[in-house]
Each structure stands twice: as structure tokens, then as C-alpha cells.
Amino acid sequence: MEYDEKLARFRQVHLNPFNKQQHEQGAGEEAPGITSQARLPELPPGEPEFRCPERVMDLGLSEDHFARPVGLFLASDVQQLRQAIQECKQVILDLPEHSEKQKDAVVRLIHLRLKLQELKDPNEDEPNIRVLLEHRFYKEKSKSVKQTCDKCNTVIWGLIQTWYTCTGCYYRCHSKCLNLISKPCVRSKVSHQAEYELNICPEAGLDSQDYRCAECRAPISLRGVPSEARQCDYTGQYYCSHCHWNDLAVIPARVVHNWDFEPRKVSRGSMRYLALMMSRPVLRLREINPLLFNYVEELVEIRKLRQDILLMKPYFITCREAMAARLLLQLQDRQHFVENDEMYSVQDLLDTHTGRLGCSLAETHTLFAKHIKLDCERCQAKGFVCELCREGDVLFPFDSHTSVCADCSAVFHRDCYYDNSTTCPRCARLTLRKQSLFREPGPDLDA
């Protein structure tokens, strides 16, 4: 009996946090037999009191032991969420720094903001592929990678926002920004134009652009009003801060003229164009700057290795073992190396400058020479014997100590060839045979 009386008194003094009727009753009238001091215990000093109106959702911050699960909120519209966010901010400021309660309040604030973003940008069913201005956009499925929209220059929250990436130029943007894009895909320019601006920073002046961004035509000024003008070192034109993010890129004109590989600030469009053109062999150095080979020793070595590989190519084309082993695929990343020795890409020049291309090309050269001179008997049988000295060693046109006749492709020792005033005995023999054929025509011409 005594226990029942104590339990009844306890229930009268302490309100049930899950019974809102008691809260409403306690707000208007006092429970019988309960003094105002005993009705609500005072909070200890330093603990802020969070009072939420009845019409606003319960954030779970006013009660420690019966808080709602993280992420569960009763807000149904944007206005309620904004009010809840402001109240949650105030609670965070009132709580002691680095306390557990403050950390929990910060977590709830984050979830409130995510919920607000969901209401402002609902997750609608978007098509997986969108084609716009030659862009081919694919809907991304990544939710954790942080990206920036190339159109509005804001962060893409992949967890709650739908975003797309162009497979041609890697242009990224929100789904809501797709219809605002006005710049065509750079991939089309690479496919049709495929050339570089080879003048170093060809500046024409801001007045030639009518004091507007060269891409989006927004008003710009050098004094920062209304928008800061940023110059692209590749095109020489000026852009606004939305079209020029101070990205760095190697400028091809500075490479071929000054052998300068220092990255410079370029616009977003120029950065994408240079990235797509990086591996395209469109630079003919002998025409652009032939003196570059006189001052860059690495280029001379690369040119010699490429010439040797072109001399090895006929051996591989006529060799079954080489075709089965697919030796020429060793250069599949630089297919132009097995086609000519004149065209270079910016990536080739960059790798030459760092030394990577010289090492990899020397290894490939050694592998090719080993197959021809040691591993394959058929390729060995296609070697030459010097007709000037008649020594027994087999010569190949890619050997460093040989010379090749430009007319008949015969191979000789270099010293022997120049000691005989570059006279080719094979060419002389073929000339005599042709003369004899014209003088004595008959049925046995091949005798």
C-alpha cells in the first residue's frame, strides 16, 4: 500500500514526456497537490532551455533521454524547416563548446539542412542519357564523390542531387542546370579542328571583347566591377570568374617555342580542350621550330629511336612470330610512332622533358632488336652483308654503326660507305644490268 502511494505521488510530480495532454494541462493549470517549485525542476546552470512552440516540429533537442532518432523530423514544408534550422543554430551556440550535446545538435542541424535541400530539389526520375549542344550527358550514380557544377559553380551534393557528366569533354553539372548550358561540347572542336594556337598568349585587349566574357558574354572589368576579368594564357582572351577558375595547364605554344613546361592559368573551356588534345599528334616540329633539335638533346635521341623503329616495322609485318606476339602493340598508346617520325603530341614532349619517354622507348627498341637479331631466324635471314668489306657479320639498317643507301636500301658499314665516297656497289650493279637489258634484248633476259 505504501508503494502505491509513493508511485501515485511520483506520477503527479513528474510529467510523462510522451503524453502531450499532460504538457497542455501543465501549461494552463497546475496538478492538484503540486506546488510550483515541485512541478518543474530547474535546470542546472550552463544548460540552455530549448522551448519549441506547439505548432513547430519536435527536433529532439529538448529532451535528452527520449530524443527522436537522428533524421526523423516532423517538418513538412520549407518554412518549418528553415525555422527549425534557426532554432537549432541557437541551441548549438548556447551549448558548451565541444560537448556531446553540442555535437548531437550539429548532427541534427546537418540532417535538417539535407531535408531542406531535398524539398527544394526533389529527386525526380531523370533520364540516363541527355544530348544537348553535342554534349552527351550520362547520369552519374556516385553519391560520395564531391564535384563542382561547371555551370553554376556550386558544389554538387551527389547524395541528394541528380547530376550529369559529358562523356566527350567531362563537363559536369546539375540536372537543373542542363537547360542553361550555352557552350557546345569541346569534343566536336577537337574532332573537326584538331590544331593548337601556336602564338604565345595572343592578347587582343579587353576592348575588343566589348568588356564582356569571351565565353558567356557577362560584363567584366579589370577593376573587379562588376566581375573580375581573368586572362587565359592559351587564348589570350579574358573571362569571368564563372568561366575561368584559375586552372593550370601546359601551354603548347610555350613548349614548341621556348621548351617551357610551366603550367599557366587557363579558362575552363581551354583546359578541357588542352586535355582532349594532349595525346593527339598534331605538332610537326621540323616545320614549327626546326632549331629545337639543336638545343634539346633528348629530342634528338627520341627522333633516332623512332627512325629505327620505322626501319624495324617491315621485319615485323612479314614475320609470323612477330605478328602472333603482337610486338607492335607495345606502342599502341603512341600509334603515330609506327607511322612516321615527324609528328609529336604535347604528351610526347612532356614525357621527353621528364625523361619517361626516352626510357620506355629505349626498352621497346631493345625488345624489337632482340627479336630481329637473336630470337627469330627468319628475321635474321633478312639481314645484310657489307659488300664493300665482305666481312661476315650480319648488318641491319637500324644498327648504329651502319649506313643505308637511299636508292636501293642496301646496308653497309658506315666507315666503308664513306671511305668509298658513298658509292653503292649494288646500285652500280643494277644500273649495269639495266643497260645490258636495253642493249641485248632477248628471251633470256633474266640470265
From Swiss-Prot:
GO molecular function: zinc ion binding
Highest taxon of source: Eukaryota
GO BP term, pick one: positive regulation of bone resorption
Keywords: Metal-binding, Phosphoprotein, Repeat, Zinc, Zinc-finger
Cross-referenced Gene3D superfamilies: 3.30.60.20
Pfam family membership, one: RH_dom
Phosphoserine modification, residue list: S436
SMART domains noted in UniProt: C1, DUF4206
Zinc finger (Phorbol-ester/DAG-type): 134-185, 364-424
Disordered: annotated segments: 17-47
Record has Acyltransferase as a keyword: no
Keyword Zinc-finger: yes
Family that this chain belongs to: Belongs to the DEF8 family.
Oligomer status and interactors: Interacts (via C-terminus) with PLEKHM1; this interaction is weak but increased in a RAB7A-dependent manner.
Entry protein name: Differentially expressed in FDCP 8 homolog
